[in-house]
Amino acid sequence: MARVKRGNVARKRRNKILRLARGFRGGNGTQFRTANQRVMKALCNAYRDRRRRKRDFRRLWIARINAAARINGVSYSRLMGGLKKADVRINRKMLAQLAVADPASFTTVVTAAKS
């Protein structure tokens, strides 16, 4: 079997990893072996956190809606149940935005949910 020297291919593969590791501290950004480990870890974290971000924002919206709803004298669960019964189709992201940016209109939404 013929011997294969992997000069160009190996260099390109290593440089690709080192390019991804640019900005990492110390040997993590300059030495291929540690850079490869750090890049794999970083990509795993990025994949996981893209999914976690959706959960985190939903929790944030719910906390904001709950705080604003309690100021208006109703709990989060009663507010959401009332909105469902009143057939008010507005999502949590928009409700949280209303609660922060325009409390007066949020109060009108709460009164619609109460009745």
Swiss-Prot record:
A GO biological-process term: translation
Coiled-coil parts of chain: none
The keyword Ribonucleoprotein appears for this protein: yes
GO molecular function terms listed in the Swiss-Prot or TrEMBL record: rRNA binding; structural constituent of ribosome
Pfam annotation, one family: Ribosomal_L20
GO annotations of cellular component type: ribonucleoprotein complex; ribosome
The entry's keywords: Ribonucleoprotein, Ribosomal protein, RNA-binding, rRNA-binding
Function: Binds directly to 23S ribosomal RNA and is necessary for the in vitro assembly process of the 50S ribosomal subunit. It is not involved in the protein synthesizing functions of that subunit.
Family classification: Belongs to the bacterial ribosomal protein bL20 family.
HAMAP family per UniProt: Ribosomal_bL20 (MF_00382)
Protein name: Large ribosomal subunit protein bL20
